[in-house]
Amino acid sequence: LTDMAEPPIAELEALDQRAAGTISELGLSAQTIDLLRDRAHLKAYYLNDPAGAVALLEEGIALPTIDPKTKAQLKLDLGDVHLLAGDMWDASLLYSQVDLDFKYDMLGHEARLRNAKVSFYAGDFLWAQAQLQVLKSSTSKLIANDAMELSLRITDNLGLDSNSVPLSYFARAELLRYQHRYDESLAVLDSLNEAFPGHALGDDILYERYRIAYARHRYEEAAGHLTKLLELFPFDILVDNALLDLGRLYEERLNDTEKAMKTYERLLFEQTGSIFVPEARTRYRRLRGDDLDGPPEPAAPSPQP
């Protein structure tokens, strides 16, 4: 249901009520906490009810029977909802708590990455950079890769003159996209292009336009943005991301197996050092008809809602 471009609100509300009924019947416990998280996600990202999501997550955090890691995950969820609602500092506080409590755990690394993004959105690029430095050596390849990409974006686009205005534009657009304010985000990206034509952020702008089109389920348009990125910026750090995302678009959304295979093959041969190679190889072999056990490797998540 939530995978539809415009899911009927009445059906989403009915789904929410069924989840509420199940939790009420079984009681809120460690066994039903995942259902509470799902319900909070539904409220925040599909029913435009972040306040309702906050109330649910706070109820879960207050539950005395859940383990520390589950409580930390609930705090991350709550931080995400606060960020969605525009409460950046509440989000940062929650991320900081998880970072402090799980400093040497993957949860702590994820919390620090999210906190670095908050600093990035707020325009505090140097502080974001300081947080990212530690994460580059994370044992999670995805976290380390995300930290490296954001760190390089800051380094490459501040420039020797330390002009942070273009990057501030982009950070604003990215935050608006995260908050589902897509038209506003696109308007900021347009303004960035007009004010700073030919800026080094050109590849990032195209990738952001792809993420917005994907979130709106406009898959042909999304594929167009990725194709343009690959044509105009063939040596950029986002190329492997773009190739994997484009292959998945062809495979899962546009039902074009031939183009999907060609895109995965290009990633395998042109981006041999990418962390996405294992997933691309698995997907390529599956489409080729090889006998593989298990689903494709979930190495790279789809763009955020």
Where are these regions (language model features)?
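Acidic, polar-rich low-complexity tracts and alpha-helical solenoid repeat scaffolds
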Residues: 1-305
